[in-house]
Regions:
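Bacterial Sec-dependent N-terminal signal peptides
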Residues: 1-42
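Intrinsic N-terminal pre-sequences and regulatory tails
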Residues: 236-249
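Acidic carboxylate motifs that coordinate Ca2+ or other divalent cations, activating on Asp/Glu
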Residues: 214
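Short, composition-biased linear "edge" segments at structural boundaries
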Residues: 226-235
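Juxtamembrane helix-loop transition sites at the ends of transmembrane segments
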Residues: 2-4, 64, 88, 235
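Flexible, disordered linker segments and immediate boundary regions flanking tandem C2H2 zinc-finger modules
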Residues: 217-220, 233
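Acidic, low-complexity Ser/Thr/Gly/Pro-rich repeat segments typical of extracellular/periplasmic
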Residues: 26-197, 202-208, 220-226, 249, ...
Length: 266
């Protein structure tokens, strides 16, 4: 194992997590022939149970669209946050996505299903980007969010592939060696990431190039970035920084240090 000391190691293998924003907001709930190409992505017309439900206790979700769709690489694109021990089964039925799972859900927890770039219309391949289905097993929906960007420190290039951004309430540097995160997001083509529907808490933030898609830092070829300071996700903390006059969504920009690929200290 390596202990991180950013003053003594080269920037060659470093990433930068930058521009992090913390905010909260209220949750808001046929193929043409001829003429210009249809560039409109599929639209959701119905969800059962409804999106943004509270006191959720179902084991099956149906999301219906206004046209026939296809799922592209859904096992890799779909992010469930908090992660489930067993990935839910996702299948197509006519114009609907069916999600089924048997795993017991955590109490008083907000879950987010983010489909990334998996949902496309059948005929033109238009992508419905980052569609989210959200529910809470409790009485309220958590609405804090974290947004930011990820770049290589040496040349400020963005990663050439999606990178998992992982949040833990366990603040040990070594936690990604043994535990899956409480919340997870993923960078897009511009290195931008967003992790939504968080509960107020203090988090340790990691970015992982996850070679085997298991949300653990367990392969020698995997790369990781991590912050040596904890991230406070709390509406009252944001108000202290920006004042009560700011309307929602409220944002606070935090400075993040460079982080390296080496294994975090035990």
């Amino acid at each position: 194992m390596f202990a991180l000391n950013s003053r003594k190691v080269s920037y060659k293998n470093f990433w930068i997590l930058s521009g992090l924003l913390v905010f909260w907001s209220c949750a808001q709930i046929g193929s043409p022939t001829g003429g210009p190409r249809d560039e409109t992505p599929p639209a959701v017309v119905e969800c059962d149970p409804p999106n943004y439900s509270t006191r959720f206790d179902a084991r099956k979700i149906q999301i219906t669209f206004d046209e026939y769709i296809v799922l592209n690489n859904v096992n890799q694109e779909l992010i469930v946050s908090p992660p489930m021990d067993e990935k839910p089964e996702v299948k197509l039925r006519k114009k609907s996505i069916i999600i089924e799972f048997e795993e017991a859900l955590r109490t008083n927890t907000t879950y987010t299903f983010n489909f990334g770039n998996a949902i496309r219309d059948l005929h033109e391949g238009n992508v419905l980007q980052n569609y989210e289905y959200v529910f809470s097993t409790g009485d309220i929906l958590d609405s804090m969010s974290v947004k930011g960007s990820l770049k290589y420190a040496e040349d400020l290039d963005v990663p050439g592939e999606p990178i998992s951004v992982m949040l833990y309430t366990d603040l040990r540097d070594s936690v990604p060696l043994t535990d899956i995160p409480l919340y997870v997001g993923r960078t897009d083509d511009s290195g931008i990431f967003s992790v939504n529907n968080l509960r107020p808490d203090v988090y340790k933030v990691f970015a992982l190039k996850d070679g085997n898609n298991n949300l653990l830092f367990d392969l020698p070829t995997e790369e990781i970035a991590f912050l040596d300071t904890s991230l406070i996700v709390n509406a009252d903390f944001v108000k202290q920084l920006l004042g009560d006059s700011i309307v929602t969504p409220v944002r606070a920009q935090l400075s993040l240090p460079s982080c390296c690929r080496r294994r975090p200290r035990e």
